[in-house]
Design a protein with these regions (language model features):
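A short, Trp-centered hydrophobic/proline-enriched beta-strand micro-motif
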Residues: 117-125, 169
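Helix-loop "lid/cap" segments that line or gate small-molecule binding pockets
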Residues: 92-101
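Alpha-helical interface subdomain recognition
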Residues: 1-81, 88, 101-106, 113-118, ...
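Short, surface-exposed charged micro-motifs
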Residues: 138-140
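A short core secondary-structure module
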Residues: 146-147, 151-195
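Flexible, small-/acidic-enriched active-site or ligand-binding loops
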Residues: 136, 189-220
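Short Gly/Pro-enriched turn/cap motifs at secondary-structure boundaries
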Residues: 87-88, 114, 129-132, 156-159, ...
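Short Ser/Thr-interspersed hydrophobic loop/turn segments at strand-loop and sheet-helix junctions
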Residues: 48, 71-76, 170, 186-191, ...
Length: 385
């Protein structure tokens, strides 16, 4: 992927924003289990960082996705996983379908304030019994006059405790699972919505997560994105941006793991020599850096195809699979070289070790990615190429 001066200017803007507005507070926010999301999003919105590839008509920059990929990569310089995940929910999970298929009225009501950072969004897909199995979700939105009446619940919803709206995937008919779902924009202040207490997660500690319940929640049918029954297809498209964001976002974070480990191993001496002089260690770090470059190349190739309008299902799935597995590999190896210090809760590599584990679970588990790749290779049993 060829970067222009405009790409590099955006890269500098994101990095300065992270350096001055986020990283000085990460330790505090990680301990608190939350960060001031409205404040940070408003500041990001003022810089245009929440609408890079969104339509100019609604306040976005109108740039192609290569710029969004650059921003996602630079958000990886945040010294925790929870905050970039919350940003990714706003930019690449709860708004792509709205931006692409939503009515002008819906985009004015929800997309514009999401781009400016005045409103925080969340995405409502996963349920207790339907995580990667999106077709199996049970939440319903039944017609009643000009409204939908929504009942059910959504689980592990990032940003939900502070969200102003949710982009909700629900069953709007009794038809077949892949054609009975719709995406509906629902204000979180709508009567009948309630939340669980904050979920206590292994990692991504600074992002807020809860279960969301819907008890006869009534919203106008005009809040539906696009045609009724097209929600599953839209969500599959939305997943592509989520997976590209997640993979791009991993690159700089993994490099930070390696860089901080190198610095520690230069200072730490055992048996009279610096740890970094141990061939096992410096060879392993070289291997891991090489793998990160492979991930970067895969992300860039997928992004190039995406901005050309090509189907990136295969490459986005591969990039997400590679990112999740490499994240575990890098953080585990680096933690080992920190020894007992790596086992301490506040150690940066220990935090990465906890945070990156979600990448192989959320947004489609590794096993789902493998199934997609196998299907496209023509080797998934019972499936034709």
């Amino acid at each position: 992927m060829i970067f222009t001066p405009e790409h590099e200017a955006l890269r500098r803007t994101v990095r300065q924003f992270v350096t001055h507005e986020i990283n000085p507070h990460v330790e505090e926010w990680e301990k608190a289990g939350r960060f001031p999301i409205h404040e940070i999003f408003r500041k990001a919105g003022e810089l245009g960082l929440l609408g890079i590839s969104k339509p100019e008509k609604f306040g976005g920059m109108g740039l192609d996705y290569s710029y969004s990929s650059v921003a996602a990569e630079e958000f990886g310089t945040i010294h925790c996983g929870g905050i970039p995940m919350s940003i990714g929910v706003q930019t690449d999970m709860c708004t792509p379908a709205l931006a692409r298929f939503g009515s002008d009225e819906l985009r004015e009501e929800f997309l514009r304030p999401a781009i400016t950072g005045e409103q925080v969004g969340c995405i409502g897909v996963s349920e207790v019994g339907a995580g990667s199995d999106v077709a199996g979700l049970k939440t319903t939105a039944r017609k009643d006059g000009d409204d939908y009446v929504i009942n059910g619940s959504k689980m592990w919803i990032t940003n939900s405790p502070s969200a102003d709206f949710i982009c909700l995937l629900a069953n709007t008919s009794d038809d077949k699972p892949h054609i009975n779902k719709s995406l509906i924009m629902v204000p979180m202040t709508t009567p009948g919505i309630s939340l669980s207490s904050h979920l206590d997660k292994l990692g991504m500690r600074s992002s807020e997560t809860a279960q969301v319940f819907f008890d006869n929640v009534r919203v106008p049918q005009r809040n539906r994105i696009g045609h009724e029954g097209a929600g599953f297809m839209m969500q599959m498209l939305q997943f592509q941006e989520e997976r590209l964001f997640g993979a791009a976002n991993m690159i700089k974070g993994l490099e930070y793991c390696i860089d901080s480990t190198i610095e520690y191993c230069k200072e730490r001496k055992t048996f009279g020599n610096a740890l970094i002089d141990n061939q096992v260690i410096h060879f392993r770090l070289a291997e891991l850096q090489t793998e990160i470059e492979c991930l970067r190349a895969l992300v860039y190739q997928a992004t190039e195809q995406y901005i050309k309008g090509q189907d990136v299902t295969r490459l986005a799935s591969m990039a997400k699979l590679k990112a999740g597995r490499l994240g575990r590999e890098v953080s585990d190896s680096c933690l080992q070289y920190w020894g007992g210090m790596g086992f301490m809760w506040d150690n940066p590599v220990a935090r990465a070790y906890r945070d990156v584990r979600l990448v192989s679970i959320g947004g489609g588990a590794d096993e789902i990615m493998l199934g997609i790749i196998c299907k496209l290779m023509g080797i998934l049993p019972g499936k034709k190429k």
